[in-house]
Amino acid sequence: MFFRPTEELQRKRVQKMFEIIAEKEGVPFLGWRDVPVKTEILGDLAKSTMPYMAQAFVGRPEGVEKGLPFDRKLYVVRRVFEQTCEESAYVASLSSRTIVYKGMMLVNQLRTFYSDLTDPDYEVAIAIVHSRFSTNTNPSWERAHPNRYIVHNGEINTIKGNADKMLSREETMYSEYLEEDMSKIIPVVNANGSDSAMLDNTLEFLMMNGMPLPLAVMITIPEPWANNRAMDEKRKDFYEYYATMMEPWDGPASIIFSDGDIMGAVLDRN
């Protein structure tokens, strides 16, 4: 799902850029689909800032397995595209397992705005819907929830330190999964994103490097374990071990997460 520029020439340039990048990364490009929408339900601000929405269809490269291995390949394609086009386009989702539909509207307007969501052929095992107001950022289509892997209520009050820590690790990062593609995806965290988006970036990176999403969530948003007498020692040892590798992303915050196969929820220790 792509949010592209409304100006035709710029939109075509962005479109062609993605096609070239996908093919260069070994992912066959199949075509574009304009997403049917009903703009009449939107408010004035949402309508005036609405991007041009389209879906890109790509093929799974030969020799790449379904699921996470394919999504890992798409992750690289998306990061190369994002860094090439900078702020001229936003990729809401590029996955073989999930599609993100979102925007500047109320929850009860979502399925009316996106006609796809009332199509009987659209059947899913998991669906997450979330609505919130922007608190520390200006509202925009791309900052609406859900993100690619999480929806988030609250704030990440340690976000500056979290983002700086992720940046400082990049010089020594190595990935047996991404290998030579590692240089294409850094920086991991988009500094222009919201706190929710930065956490989403981090969870995505951990997952693409072989860490199950629930584990990635547990080490970034740990329980209150240090002086918790009610917690068993084995669980304390777990959190103490991972605390040497990742600082906590502290809220207060509540998170629902999904990769299309599993779904879970967590509260932070505040």
Predicted regions and their residues:
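Conserved short alpha-helical segments that host acidic/polar catalytic motifs at enzyme active sites
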Residues: 1-270
